[in-house]
Amino acid sequence: MSDLEPAKNPEGASHVSVLLGEVVAALASGPGDMVIDGTFGAGGYTRAILATGASVTAFDRDPSVQRFAAEFSATDGRFRLIQDRFSQITEYLEDASVDGVTLDLGVSSMQLDEAERGFSFMRDGPLDMRMGADGPTAADLVNDLDHTELARILYVYGEEHASRRIASFIIKRREERPFTRTLDLAHVIERALGGRKGAKVHPATRSFQGLRIAVNAELDELEAGLLAAERVLKPGGRLAVVTFHSLEDRIVKNFLAERAGRTPGGSRHLPPVEAGAPPSFQLISSKAIAPGEAELAVNPRARSSKLRAAVRTTAPVWSEAS
């Protein structure tokens, strides 16, 4: 863990950025460099990157981060926040113009701690789950989707094997009254799964993950963001991505392996490339970097995190390769 002071959440408790020291090392930024913090949050990565002497352009679609950004804007002219999704980087920055891009994926502990955001199955709040200010809420999905689509979301995005049973319980209950609160939904999921007493993981964990990913189109956003990073990074620029579950990690792993010439890869979101396209990235490490025991002791949230990093080569972006 870095000895840099972590950013603070609204309640004053520390919001500790995961794998902070490892991310800073992977970016290897310094004075004169421009780094993109694609998931600003409470500013933990931004603070550490600024400490290296680099400038930071941060992105975040969550309006609530403005209160953290104001602190940086007031004290450091090397920082700016763009209130948008990280997949939109190319709308604001020129190709091959930045020295580093970092992404810290998924929901933050800050968002989980704020019951009114509707992400938590442990705190009662409106069934929202939106990271931004617009679009359908989790309540919209739970109350409107048919059984097939609801079960698909829980299975594909939540990796919940009891997805059909949970969807059936949800639909039966919503016929009586619509879902509006997080704990209401969590209790129905618990009943569908029989409580799973003694389980270390809450029964609603996977279902809430699936709904959150669907509400925010997180996997589509990730793949679009990786393509954007490939475009805006200079030759020698570095990409560092922290993931928290297998769906995210698989996308990042396959993208970087493919772009480094390690595997054919392939995704419905990525443009087709002819065989023999020159590698656009070189892997910094062939394996993901995991948190050490010291970090896990003080930050349990880091338990499932993985860091993958790579260096941009001089090759063109793959959509332009021939």
From Swiss-Prot:
It is an enzyme of class 2 (transferase). It comes from Caulobacter sp. (strain K31). It catalyses: cytidine(1402) in 16S rRNA + S-adenosyl-L-methionine = N(4)-methylcytidine(1402) in 16S rRNA + S-adenosyl-L-homocysteine + H(+). Keywords: Cytoplasm, Methyltransferase, rRNA processing, S-adenosyl-L-methionine, Transferase. It comes from the Bacteria. GO terms for biological process: rRNA base methylation. Its main location: cytoplasm. It is found in: Cytoplasm. S-adenosyl-L-methionine binds at residues 43-45, 60, 86, 104, 111. It holds the Pfam family Methyltransf_5. Its EC number is 2.1.1.199. Belongs to the methyltransferase superfamily. RsmH family. This is Ribosomal RNA small subunit methyltransferase H. GO terms for cellular component: cytoplasm. Specifically methylates the N4 position of cytidine in position 1402 (C1402) of 16S rRNA. The lineage of its organism: Bacteria, Pseudomonadati, Pseudomonadota, Alphaproteobacteria, Caulobacterales. GO terms for molecular function: rRNA (cytosine-N4-)-methyltransferase activity. InterPro entries: RsmH, SAM-dep_MeTrfase_MraW_recog, SAM-dependent_MTases_sf.
